[in-house]
């Protein structure tokens, strides 16, 4: 998300658009505050307005309070975070929500949906999600084709304050297992992630060419 913010700030030198950053505190004790601090620091340095939201204020509870009622904490976290981001963007009058999803995130999500047989979610993948409801703000993913390692390398080379720690709940998720599998195989077979992404893009192209009726 921090790299996305820096990239969009740079694009303002060439394109005329307003930019507002949004942070969401899910309520994970001992973890989330580091990310919030990094968001505040980067927004101040870039002179970008930062709107801070939290599960506690917007939804009435912290993720720590409710995660035990779900198979994975990622389930409620994703739902409520997306809802808060969309509501905030709608209230701000934004035309787009730009997220920090990178190549690794995308192929993990793709394989998760494939493993679950949830082919309906395929339409939600890709660098841009079109309007599907008047109150849902379209999403863009500027880093869609950028590997996670390159994002980390950029931050180190440019001395950017980012939060690299893994979420303490992530190890319980299917995503964590798939991420580990992909990273292990990338070490053995370099380029496997890019190959999966290329296959993924072909599937999306094929799917879009199929008549709906």
Located regions from the model:
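Cys/His-rich short segments
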Residues: 208-213
């Amino acid at each position: 998300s921090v790299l996305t913010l820096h990239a969009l700030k740079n694009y303002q030198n060439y394109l005329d658009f307003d930019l507002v950053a949004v942070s969401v505190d899910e309520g994970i004790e001992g973890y989330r505050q580091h990310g919030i601090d990094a968001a505040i620091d980067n927004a101040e340095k870039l002179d970008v307005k930062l709107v801070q939201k939290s599960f506690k204020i917007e939804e009435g509870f912290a993720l720590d309070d409710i995660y035990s009622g779900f198979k994975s904490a990622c389930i409620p976290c994703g739902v409520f975070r997306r809802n808060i981001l969309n509501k905030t963007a709608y209230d701000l009058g934004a035309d787009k929500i730009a997220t920090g999803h990178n190549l690794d995130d995308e192929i993990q999500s793709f394989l998760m949906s494939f493993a679950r047989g949830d082919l309906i979610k395929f339409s939600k993948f890709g660098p841009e999600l079109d309007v599907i409801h008047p109150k849902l703000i379209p999403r863009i993913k500027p880093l869609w084709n950028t590997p996670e390692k390159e994002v980390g390398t950029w931050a180190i080379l440019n001395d950017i304050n980012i939060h690299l720690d893994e979420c303490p709940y992530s190890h319980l998720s299917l995503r964590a297992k798939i991420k580990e599998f992909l990273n292990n195989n990338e070490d053995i077979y370099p380029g496997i992630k890019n190959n999966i992404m290329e296959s993924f893009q072909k599937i999306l192209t094929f799917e879009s060419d199929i008549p709906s009726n």
